[in-house]
Amino acid sequence: MASTTTCTRFTDEYQLFEELGKGAFSVVRRCMKIPTGQEYAAKIINTKKLSARDHQKLEREARICRLLKHPNIVRLHDSISEEGFHYLVFDLVTGGELFEDIVAREYYSEADASHCIQQILESVNHCHLNGIVHRDLKPENLLLASKSKGAAVKLADFGLAIEVQGDQQAWFGFAGTPGYLSPEVLRKDPYGKPVDMWACGVILYILLVGYPPFWDEDQHRLYQQIKAGAYDFPSPEWDTVTPEAKDLINKMLTINPAKRITASEALKHPWISHRATVASMMHRQETVDCLKKFNARRKLKGAILTTMLATRNFSAAKSLLKKPDGVKINNKANVVTSPKENIPTPALEPQTTVIHNPDGNKESTESSNTTIEDEDVKARKQEIIKVTEQLIEAINNGDFEAYTKICDPGLTAFEPEALGNLVEGMDFHRFYFENALSKSNKPIHTIILNPHVHLVGEDAACIAYIRLTQYMDGSGMPKTMQSEETRVWHRRDGKWQNVHFHRSGSPTVPIKPPCIPNGKENYSGGTSLWQNI
């Protein structure tokens, strides 16, 4: 039997140094090619953890990166497979993110923005000429070759890039990053190269004023803005921007992809090709100031998403929101109404803990550019977990009014207290709110274990989880009850409502039972002493 030889070319030819970045299945480290002393960045992928689909994506990324050779694109120099690992050896770019460099500059003008977007357009044009659509153009993927003044802008991360034939339009899946998605992707229409030009329009808008054209903390409303092309050029910051710059943005942010400007056409636009005479040279300090806040918000959001659901331990106090100076809050939805304002202090949440949340946001620090199908699904699943937490908070607080707002009037339920019967409507549950929950002032803490969310189309979802309820019994001893729950949610008029639930195990919210002289708890009356929703 012939012996198999394991490839060790990377191990033999390269020396690894410090870590530069990390993702779910990969790490990026500085490395040196031993024979030449040349330094590179090695993206090291743990292939033992990859699915067959992930292997295909890795092969596609390597194939695309090998094809693209341009001064404004981070170049792939080598692709090596070894036992359990795959190594992609890229240019070592040391200048950091373009947007971070801009805010450190003493002088920044419209002409500088023109030069930045020109380099981005050059990279996009090269991709499109080679039949590649990047699909994830955003600030995190725009790097500088070095820290030297005037260093080249380099487009990075082709993990979502696809290969297309000419001007082919097809449905390649929901991919990208929310604020940079094009209307056609959100409509789930066939798409192609124009999606990159839409993202360029968003980037150019930010380069000129320091905040994005489309903004809403609520992803659904953000998508509605994008699909409607609902952006403008508000005063006073846009008053000092030349008409030619606005014209180029309008051509990039054209809703109809067939009429949207191409990369090659954009490079010929007067604001790019005749920068010296067309673009303003005035220093834009307000843009720099706004961009600092924009960068801080991006970094904060990434950090929050990374740690958000490791464990969530909420205060037993009522939800509070401290409003920082200058932040406008919509009290109904706790939405920041302007992207130019300061970063809001997060609201405290009810006393519910989510543990081991496989369906929540677990962002890698590599980038937020997982497929938006994954991203969108994660966001929608998180919405379901959130509204489930709110429902349980209403139960814990004995707040029947809040409960009825979250539940459908025709709510159906199977639960132990109904003795196998299907309960319909709110009257069965009203009894417990009025006679038990409202009279209980004992602290209650609920833990949701292992929530799993199944999305059923756009407007329906099912969540299954284990619910642990901690409380103090009549003698002051700590107790815990467990139930297994499934809830079905339906979205009507943009609002999620619980339409059905099925619960097994113990009832979930304790009511202090009477005590008999020997100290033993009396559960006479059966389960009617326990809240059952």
Swiss-Prot record:
Database matches in CDD domains: STKc_CaMKII
Enzyme active site: D136 (proton acceptor)
Region (Calmodulin-binding): 291-301
Membrane topology type: Peripheral membrane protein
Entry's Gene Ontology BP terms: positive regulation of cardiac muscle hypertrophy; protein phosphorylation; regulation of cellular localization
SMART domains for this protein: S_TKc (SM00220)
One of the record's GO molecular function terms: protein serine kinase activity
Function, in words: Calcium/calmodulin-dependent protein kinase involved in the regulation of Ca(2+) homeostatis and excitation-contraction coupling (ECC) in heart by targeting ion channels, transporters and accessory proteins involved in Ca(2+) influx into the myocyte, Ca(2+) release from the sarcoplasmic reticulum (SR), SR Ca(2+) uptake and Na(+) and K(+) channel transport. Targets also transcription factors and signaling molecules to regulate heart function. In its activated form, is involved in the pathogenesis of dilated cardiomyopathy and heart failure.
Record protein name field: Calcium/calmodulin-dependent protein kinase type II subunit delta
